[in-house]
Amino acid sequence: MDTYNIISLLLVGFIWGGTNPLIKRGSEGVSKVKKDNFLSQIIYEFVYLWTRPSYTIPMLINLSGSVVFFYTLSKVDISLVVPISNSLTFLFTSLMGMLLGEKVLHFKSYLGMIFVLAGVTICVSSKF
């Protein structure tokens, strides 16, 4: 695995993890949309979400992370891409949530992040 692929994996984790809390914030209020039947409910929820830039912009950025993910998947072994990108997504989601004031991270959260980084480092170094 070369440096470019490592950067791609970091980028996927950063994009996915960084946008998850923003998508959550942008989707606030969708549960208040109430319609009489199932199909109308789905349509109105879709319209509600996609007409709000606070949801749409982070979602589109998040989807661009999927493009980077699939590109990286074509270049790197799947046994590395999936666990590394998912682990880094968790890490960046936690950090972004903390930056946005969603929750205060405790010792166990930081310890978990250290373990994630150690695991990612082991996975990456095993392929050099």
Curated annotation (Swiss-Prot):
It holds the Pfam family TMEM234. Disruption phenotype: No visible phenotype. One of its GO terms (cellular component) is membrane. It is a multi-pass membrane protein. It is found in: Membrane. The chain crosses the membrane at residues 3-23, 53-73, 80-100, 104-124. Keywords: Membrane, Transmembrane, Transmembrane helix. SUPFAM superfamilies: Multidrug resistance efflux transporter EmrE. InterPro entries: TMEM234 (IPR018908). Signal peptide: none annotated. Belongs to the TMEM234 family. PANTHER family: TRANSMEMBRANE PROTEIN 234. This is Transmembrane protein 234 homolog. It comes from Dictyostelium discoideum (Social amoeba). The lineage of its organism: Eukaryota, Amoebozoa, Evosea, Eumycetozoa, Dictyostelia.
